Amino acid sequence: MRRSRILGIGSYLPKSLVTNDELACTVETSDEWIVKRTGIRQRYIAADDQMTSDMAVEAAKLALNDSGINKQDVDLIVVATTTPDRTFPSCATIVQSKLECKNAFAFDIQAVCSGFIYAMAIADNFIKSGQVNVSLVIGAEVMSRILDWKDRSTCVLFGDGAGAVVLSNNSARNTGVISTILYSDGTLHNLLYTSGGTAYNGVAGTICMNGTVVFEHAIEKLSASIVEILNKNNLSIDEVNWFVLHQANIRIIELVARRLKIPSEKMVISINQHANTSAASIPLALSYAKNSGKLKQDDLVILAAIGAGITWGVCLVRM
């Protein structure tokens, strides 16, 4: 049986770091207010001439180097992003060109903060079907360009960055991507959206969010999806080494852990370092877990994210 395994992980954050105190100089907020409500202490902002594809390429290079896979052996590139360089062509094809992955086909997936889980599921199924052997899965965002920097309810929450993994065919029975479950509820699309769009008004717009309701759905849906994937695979929380949830708000992560009785030491937390990076959130957290010595070979990991749409998803992986 074919199964996709994560062979390499890479991440990239822009050079410009903006602390909460620096934000407080431009909008009515404070470090104490932001940390207490979100757990965020800082975020990174892309340079004016830096595109989503640029960050995606840097993360992908590190993931490829970590995996030992040659770029010419990559068959598929999937980029999860809601902030592509241009309306078209896809960010993924630009990444393919910059990386010189001449043998790959490439496309974008847009599920906002859930995008990386969706991209993982798609790449995993391409590998399982035998259509590809090696896939680059990337989450990359420049959220700073769709923020209203005068709106403290949203501008303090987001940052820019990219993360990537290399998935490769692996026949070992208990290793790799074991299970993924994807969900969406389009009736809730008005809870989190941008004020613009190509067809809507021809401009990118800025993020608009009903934060309280999104918060409630996040706790409910992330908790339920984790329970579902555990039950589907006859596993208990005790058997899982790490839970990597979308890094949107520390309180969401803590409340999901409390609801499911997950020990806090099993929750991977990186939001304090880079804020909510949307589709880049999960691979950035994975990279942090690996680089800090937490994540080890054979660890059983649950990845879970929720985003606008509303979309959400969960993935069970043996490293």
Curated annotation (Swiss-Prot):
What the protein does? Catalyzes the condensation reaction of fatty acid synthesis by the addition to an acyl acceptor of two carbons from malonyl-ACP. Catalyzes the first condensation reaction which initiates fatty acid synthesis and may therefore play a role in governing the total rate of fatty acid production. Possesses both acetoacetyl-ACP synthase and acetyl transacylase activities. Its substrate specificity determines the biosynthesis of branched-chain and/or straight-chain of fatty acids.
User: What name does the UniProt record give this protein?
Assistant: Beta-ketoacyl-[acyl-carrier-protein] synthase III
An example Gene Ontology molecular-function term: 3-oxoacyl-[acyl-carrier-protein] synthase activity
Catalytic activities: malonyl-[ACP] + acetyl-CoA + H(+) = 3-oxobutanoyl-[ACP] + CO2 + CoA
NCBIfam families of this UniProt entry?
Answer: fabH, PRK09352.1
The ranges of region (ACP-binding) come to 247-251
Tell me the keywords, alphabetical order. Acyltransferase, Cytoplasm, Fatty acid biosynthesis, Fatty acid metabolism, Lipid biosynthesis, Lipid metabolism, Multifunctional enzyme, Transferase
Tell me the route in metabolism or biology where this protein functions.
Lipid metabolism; fatty acid biosynthesis
UniProt record similarity statement? Belongs to the thiolase-like superfamily. FabH family.
InterPro entries found in the cross-reference section: ACP_syn_III_C (IPR013747), ACP_syn_III_N (IPR013751), FabH (IPR004655), Thiolase-like (IPR016039)
Could you tell me the EC number(s) of this protein?
Answer: 2.3.1.180
Q: How does it assemble?
A: Homodimer.
List, alphabetically, the GO terms of the cellular component aspect. Answer: cytoplasm
Any idea where this protein resides? Cytoplasm
In this protein, the active site sits at C113, H246, N276
The domain section of the record reads: The last Arg residue of the ACP-binding site is essential for the weak association between ACP/AcpP and FabH.
Q: Does the keyword Cytoplasm apply?
A: yes
Instruction: State the superkingdom.
Output: Bacteria
Which Pfam families does the UniProt entry name for this protein?
A: ACP_syn_III (PF08545), ACP_syn_III_C (PF08541)
**Which organism is this protein's natural source?**
Ehrlichia ruminantium (strain Gardel)
Any GO BP annotation: secondary metabolite biosynthetic process
The primary site where this protein sits is cytoplasm
